[in-house]
């Protein structure tokens, strides 16, 4: 994983962490789009690692991956709490469904990133 890939992933999560999670449909669609982008990136990252075949060389090329991974988990946890809060405060059924889907996607991405990180250890 080169530094551009790590930077792109970090940028996506950083933008997600700064999003204003308002109640308009545009804001909700933007949030889901960001989550879907994160999921697609996670999928492509996993495929790239499996193609490389040598996970130790991946670790050597990116010695800071553990710190960055920890930061990403913190950002995901913050997003989970933010989405949970929004889910509790909204009464609009469309928003509730959207936030529930976003929450489910965040849990899935967190679990798969965790699984991926264990493969790298």
Curated annotation (Swiss-Prot):
A single cellular component GO annotation: host cell nucleus
Keyword Amino-acid biosynthesis tagged: no
Entry superkingdom: Viruses
GO BP terms in the entry: exit of virus from host cell nucleus through nuclear pore
Keyword Acetylation: no
Pfam families membership: Flu_NS2
Subcellular location: Virion; Host nucleus
UniProt KW keywords: Host nucleus, Host-virus interaction, Transport, Virion
Motif Nuclear export signal mapped to chain: 12-21, 85-94
Entry-linked InterPro entries: Flu_NS2
SUPFAM superfamilies associated with the record: Nonstructural protein ns2, Nep, M1-binding domain (SSF101156)
Misc remark: Average number present in a viral particle is estimated to be 130-200 molecules.
Function statement: Mediates the nuclear export of encapsidated genomic RNAs (ribonucleoproteins, RNPs). Acts as an adapter between viral RNPs complexes and the nuclear export machinery of the cell. Possesses no intrinsic RNA-binding activity, but includes a C-terminal M1-binding domain. This domain is believed to allow recognition of RNPs bound to the protein M1.
Complexes and interactors: Interacts with protein M1. May interact with host nucleoporin RAB/HRB and exportin XPO1/CRM1.
Family: Belongs to the influenza viruses NEP family.
Name recorded for this polypeptide: Nuclear export protein
Gene from which the chain derives: NS
């Amino acid at each position: 994983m080169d530094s551009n890939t790590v930077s792109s992933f970090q940028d996506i999560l950083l933008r997600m962490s700064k999003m204003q999670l308002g109640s308009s449909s545009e804001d909700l669609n933007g949030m889901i789009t960001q989550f879907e982008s994160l999921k697609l990136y996670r999928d492509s990252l996993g495929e790239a690692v499996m193609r490389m075949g040598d996970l130790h060389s991946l670790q050597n090329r990116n010695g800071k991956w553990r710190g960055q991974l920890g930061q990403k988990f913190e950002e995901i946890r913050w997003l989970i709490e933010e989405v949970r809060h929004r889910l509790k405060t909204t009464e609009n059924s469309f928003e509730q469904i959207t936030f529930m889907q976003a929450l489910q996607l965040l849990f899935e991405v967190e679990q798969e990133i965790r699984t991926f990180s264990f493969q790298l250890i």
